[in-house]
């Protein structure tokens, strides 16, 4: 359970970063990150 909560908090932080930085390298790295999560 703890791992799931930490993951949700991490994703929430990533979403906040996306809202602050629209486009650019952040968006590319986030797309790669989500593709990585889908493979698991």
Swiss-Prot record:
InterPro entries: Competence_ComC. This is Competence-stimulating peptide. It comes from Streptococcus mitis. The gene is comC. The keyword Secreted applies. Keywords: Competence, Pheromone, Secreted. GO terms for molecular function: pheromone activity. Its main location: secreted. The keyword Ligase does not apply. It holds the Pfam family ComC. Residues 1-24 form a propeptide. GO terms for cellular component: extracellular region. Belongs to the ComC family.
